[in-house]
From Swiss-Prot:
Molecular function as annotated in GO: nicotinate-nucleotide-dimethylbenzimidazole phosphoribosyltransferase activity
Superkingdom per UniProt: Bacteria
InterPro entries noted in UniProt: Nict_dMeBzImd_PRibTrfase, Nict_dMeBzImd_PRibTrfase_bact, Nict_dMeBzImd_PRibTrfase_N, Nict_dMeBzImd_PRibTrfase_sf
Enzyme class: transferase
GO BP annotation list: cobalamin biosynthetic process
Name assigned to this protein: Nicotinate-nucleotide--dimethylbenzimidazole phosphoribosyltransferase
Active-site residues (renumbered): E305 (proton acceptor)
Species this protein is from: Roseobacter denitrificans (strain ATCC 33942 / OCh 114) (Erythrobacter sp. (strain OCh 114))
Gene behind the chain: cobT
Pfam families: DBI_PRT (PF02277)
Protein family per UniProt: Belongs to the CobT family.
């Protein structure tokens, strides 16, 4: 595939010319929903969810047949400061687990009929410690964005992205704070389960990173300076999905931080996205409010690897099946009250 962009300015150009959902399909789907054999509003949020999906797919009676889940993995220079309860080598070990079918996301993808792809990004070369320097050069962040862009299957009709990377809740907290404001304590959570001392280290690292990169004002530059390769890859995949009009189910805190960097650059960048779930990472709720995305599920998950969004795929599948498969009052010969 020819590179879609080679500079961050070219990514910004894409963000300035994003396609919109199809208004006619939205109107037609809403009209059909109003004639289905149920009281108005009886399916709750499923109704608006299905109409949203129809608008992005450009058809009033859509189907979900080719969902795609992509998990990106990366390593972080800040991990050396003790921000995680697990060592950095766990990232590569978990990638092998994904590839061998042994992780939670493998089971969920199989259960809901989704294609699962796993991409490890230069695990042998962690990003720079962002308390000392930008996490990535422009060339490195472009490479990661492009990995995500290329990973999206153009034939997919739903996209879910997730991550694996020791230390990435810390980089996500720094990125969220840089994009949406607030103190480090507002955004830093326990991640993999650090104790109070580990939590204090995470807060210090985020504070130092924010101070070092305080003059960076653009969302993509914040992603470069504070993010990680897998975080940038998720952003690239989310952006590619928008260009292809593929609806996206967002996963947890780290995925939403990646999405937030796009929104910080272009406020309408996430209109094709729905939050799949609210995770147990304490600041995820704050981040969902910042990006304006109420979650579909709240199950206390804090695993990452796209697991919560994968579960929400079942909700979207059900919503779309009802819109497209239910009979109208006229078709069923039922009196419309």
């Amino acid at each position: 595939m020819t590179a879609a962009f080679s500079t961050l300015d070219e990514v910004r150009d894409i963000l300035r010319a994003l396609p919109e959902s199809d208004a006619e399909s939205i109107d037609d789907a809403a009209a059909r929903n109003g004639q289905l054999t149920k009281p108005p509003g009886a399916l709750g949020r499923l109704e608006a969810l299905a109409i949203w999906y129809a608008g992005w797919r450009g058809v009033a009676t859509p189907r979900i047949e080719t969902p795609q889940i992509i998990v990106f993995a990366g390593n972080h220079g800040i991990a050396a400061q003790g921000v995680s309860a697990f060592p950095a080598e766990v990232t590569a070990q978990m990638v092998l687990n994904f590839q061998h079918g042994g992780a939670a996301i493998n089971q969920l993808a199989a259960t809901f009929g989704a294609k699962l792809d796993v991409h490890a990004l230069a695990l042998e070369q962690p990003t720079a410690d962002f308390t000392q320097a930008p996490a990535m050069s422009e060339a490195e962040v472009i490479d990661a964005l492009h990995t995500g862009w290329q990973a999206v299957d153009a034939a997919a009709d739903v996209l879910i992205v997730g991550e694996m990377g020791i230390g990435n809740t810390t980089c996500a907290a720094a990125l969220a704070a840089a994009c949406f404001g607030g103190a480090p304590a507002d955004w830093v959570g326990r991640g993999t389960g650090v104790d109070d001392a580990g939590l204090a280290i995470k807060q210090r690292v985020v504070a130092e990173g924010l101070a070092r990169h305080a003059t960076v004002h653009d969302g993509l530059e914040k992603l470069r300076c504070l993010g990680g390769r897998e975080v940038a890859a998720m952003a690239g995949a989310i952006l590619r999905a928008r260009v292809l009009r593929i609806p996206v189910l967002l996963d947890g805190f780290i995925c939403c931080a990646a999405a937030g960097s796009l929104m910080h650059t272009a406020p309408d960048a996430l209109e094709h996205c729905v939050a799949g779930h609210l995770s147990a990472e304490g600041s995820h709720d704050r981040l969902l409010q910042a990006i304006g995305k109420p979650p579909l599920l709240s199950l206390g998950l804090r695993l990452g690897e796209a697991s919560g969004a994968a579960l929400s795929l079942a909700v979207l599948q059900g919503a779309v099946a009802c819109l497209s498969g239910m009979a109208t009052f006229a078709e069923a010969g039922v009196a419309d009250g």
